[in-house]
């Protein structure tokens, strides 16, 4: 099972360059995490910069991590807009969270549907909502079977490595209860890297940045 900051049943989205290595992640909908709105901020926190040849102290394998800055979500239901904003910023596009939320139809009581978030992401990044055929773009899929040897997990890890190596972050929907005891609901974060096992044959850990203002660290931001 992939460890570190990843749920046992994760939703993810990957940018793919062709149909043979098409998408990844979520048939379910993005939901809010029931977060308090009292300390919302638009602060950008620099993320840790790590050379992709570093050895991880736990797995002993190669670590690859994109140098992306955390954008903290402004409102309790803005996890998807903030995540998409980070992905766009990593590609040199600056789009305000409020604008993205409006385009995605982010709801005051629910949050954002993943399908809407990915359409808006593709629109800004590639110029179309839904990629077809061999077109590059983010697509949705689900890791329905979390077992490490399942086809779902193998496909996820293969595409994770491909996308991070190509410089494209991942769009994750995580189960809050798996990552943060006492919390509930689904939550969007941006996947920024991975660590391989010592022999390089498998993914041991994944890294993500969490836009929630409830989990920001003074040094590492949402990492």
Model region roles, listed by residue range:
Residues 99, 103-223:
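Conserved active-site-adjacent core of cysteine acyl-enzyme catalytic domains
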Residues 1-19, 23-135, 199:
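Active-site-adjacent structural segments surrounding the nucleophilic cysteine of cysteine proteases
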């Amino acid at each position: 099972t992939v460890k570190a900051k990843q749920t046992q049943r994760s939703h993810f989205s990957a940018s793919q360059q062709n149909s043979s290595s098409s998408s990844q992640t979520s048939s379910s909908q993005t939901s809010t995490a029931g977060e308090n709105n009292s300390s919302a901020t638009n602060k950008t926190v620099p993320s840790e910069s790590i050379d992709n040849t570093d050895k991880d102290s736990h797995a002993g394998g190669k670590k690859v991590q994109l140098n992306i800055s955390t954008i903290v979500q402004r409102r309790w239901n803005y996890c998807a807009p903030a995540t998409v904003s980070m992905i766009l910023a990593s590609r040199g596009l600056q789009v305000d969270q409020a604008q993205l939320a409006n385009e995605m139809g982010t709801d005051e009581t629910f949050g954002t549907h993943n399908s809407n978030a990915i359409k808006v992401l593709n629109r800004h990044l590639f110029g179309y909502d839904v990629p077809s055929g061999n077109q590059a773009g983010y697509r949705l899929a689900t890791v329905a079977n979390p077992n490490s040897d399942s086809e779902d997990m193998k496909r996820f890890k293969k595409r994770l490595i491909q996308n991070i190596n190509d410089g494209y972050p991942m769009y994750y929907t995580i189960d809050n209860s798996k990552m943060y005891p006492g919390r509930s609901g689904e939550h969007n974060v941006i996947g920024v890297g991975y660590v391989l096992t010592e022999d390089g044959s498998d993914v041991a850990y994944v890294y993500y940045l969490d836009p929630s203002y409830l989990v920001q660290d003074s040094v590492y931001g949402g990492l």
